[in-house]
Structure formats: C-alpha cells, structure tokens
Amino acid sequence: AEGIHLNDPLMSPIYETCAELGMPLNIHVAEPYWMYLPDDKYNDGLMNGKKWKIDMSIPGMQSHEQLIAQFSEAVKNHPNTLFVACHFINCSYDLSIVGRLLDEYSNLYVDMSARFGETASIPRYMRKFYTRYADRILYGTDNGMSAEMYETTFRILETDDEHFYVPDYHYHWYYSGFDLPD
C-alpha cells in the first residue's frame, strides 16, 4: 500500500533508462490472486493461507486488480521498455488476462516461474497458451536448482504424463504434462 506504485511517474526514469540500455526489466507484480480473497470454502489457496495472506483491511492496500491495472499502465506508457513479469503476472488463476496483455503490448514478456501448482492441472489449455505465446514466455524458477525441480519442470513441459503429484511443492492440485512441441 505504501511507497511508489508501478505507474507512478517517479518510476519513469528507471523505465526509460532500461529502454536506453536495452535492458529488460524483470518485475514482480502483485501476489497470487487467492491471497487477496476471504478465508472461506471458495478460496483454493486457503491451504497456504496461514503462511501467505494479504490483509485487505489495511487502509490503502491495493487489490490484485488495481496492481495489475497499474502495471498495465506502466507497460503502455513505456513502449520502448521490455518488461518481463514474473509468475505469469500472478494471473495464473485466469490466464486470459495474461493473454490479453501479451496481445496488447509487444514489449511485455512473462516468466513461468513457480506457477505449475496452478497451471499443470489444465494441460490442454496450457499447451495452447504456451504454443501461442512461445516467443513471449521465459523460463524462470523460484524453486532452487535441485535435480528434482528440473526433472519436474521437464516432465510438465515435455511429457503427456497425467495426474501426478509433487509433494514438496505444497499444492493440493494434481499435475499433468503439457506435451509441448520442440
């Protein structure tokens, strides 16, 4: 809530300097959507809610929608700056938002880091999404560099394996492979 937001004019010198240097700006936007939702039976992220939660009762706290809108405005206002939004812009709950922004802004890229828990349960949709935006999705990780992490990543991206679990990722959804083309 406090501080400078992504669409604040005070951020413009950073964006413009990145553009002048041809340096992409890797940026985190918001948090996963469920962190902003009430703790009730409809909140899929509730299992992680004790550890990760946004307290929306704090005066001035920005909603998920507001943060995405501010980011979108910053990307729009700085077309010569390359933005790389981590974690599918934290919109993995509705990737049509990501698709709309990628379609609208040619200077926007996303990374896939730490979002298989939300996306590997919808493999057909993800295969289409990754295929459509193949040149705009970057690899990233927030999960360390263990052999198991890479094996899981490649299993999801490259195979058509169905309904498997990865216990150390702390999600209750199953995973399925996207069977992406080369």
Residue ranges and their predicted role:
Residues 66-73, 82-182:
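H/E-rich (His + Asp/Glu) clusters that bind or coordinate divalent metals
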Residues 1-97:
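Divalent metal-binding pocket/active-site signature
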